Amino acid sequence: MAELVYNEQGRLLFTEEMRKEYTILIPNMLPIHFRLLERIFNNHGYKMKLLTSTGRKIVDEGLRYVHNDTCYPALLTIGQFIDALKSGEYDVNKTALMMVQSGGGCRASNYIHLIRKALKKCGMEQVPVISLNLASLEKNPGFHLTPALLAELITAVCYADLLMLLANQVRPYENNKGDTDKLIDVWTDKLTELNFSYTAFDKTAVQIVKDFSEVPFTPAPDKIKVGVVGEIYIKYSPLGNNDLHKFLESEGCEVYCPGLIDFLIFMGDHHVVETELYHVKYKKYIASKAVKGFFKMMQNKIIKAVGPSRFFGPTPFEEAKKDVEPFISPANKMGEGWLLTAEMIDMINMGINNIVCAQPFGCLPNHIIGKGMIRKLRETYPQSNIVPIDYDPGATRVNQENRIKLMLSTARQQMNEKKAADQ
């Protein structure tokens, strides 16, 4: 067992010795994205394991070690960690935990401390917790985001966004069930072999689009399209949203869910806006502007690759930002900030009027930028059909799915009325 080393504040560090022998567990948020991230870290000498466990036992473990008023994503991720450590599959003396930390004003920035508190409560204080962030928070001698590693991680996010975008547009129409998921597996292996090359991105993206366009499919013009927005973990995570995307597809829908690139551009953008409004943190302004510019460039590459095909690509960030200005200030940055409202407007402009706004119960930012904006959106866009769905330990899956089914019933009724009017 590696020697336990603590910093001056008493935080257990992840050391270079631990890097050689410890398994690092990370909770799953975006299935495609995190599979690619797992591959990258393993290629760079880490032993990373992506947790994909589900079930009520995860919630129960979370409730044992986290206050039930804490954010639902925190409860789930901590429950998933504790469940894995108790499973016997991992040596608790040779296991570390990793959590993505934004460093923003959302309570998600405190998840790291809640994880440590839970570990102490269940007698596993010897397990180090690593913060994965770009805000220079909690440095560890055994974990370094080197330029090469960071470049691969960033490019992998862009590849994963493209894979998710195409998969959502192909899977509901595929002739042979499972073809789309097999193609994702194929491209996961290919991208790993390419080391998630940035220089080959343009060429590779075009090939990915070509491969997805060749999946045998049957058009279904009457298929209902449903957009999914909300708090970042609940929106994407199958554990957090009770497999919402799969449920919608089982109900005969095509799901549209915005990619992670928009959120990363938004993170850079709000630092730029903050500096322009308050004239502070000029160094952060320069860095944020560079991050924003890079991801906007990558988004444009995806739009260009998808352009000639039958698929539709993401809306350019600046266009979405301009559309949301009459509704909410660009200075509204907590949680998903104005971006969540912009995503709903963007979907409606694309003709996707049916939207599920998924959020943890009691998530203050989402009550403002999600639920709080629905009335105004309905007034401006009467055709919009938006349903907010809360997720928490006491919410039953049946009630959530029944509310979504009611929204889908309204969507089918609107479709039939439109058909009748067009005849």
Model-assigned labels for residue ranges:
Residues 1-423:
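An N-terminal assembly and electron-transfer interface module characteristic of large anaerobic redox
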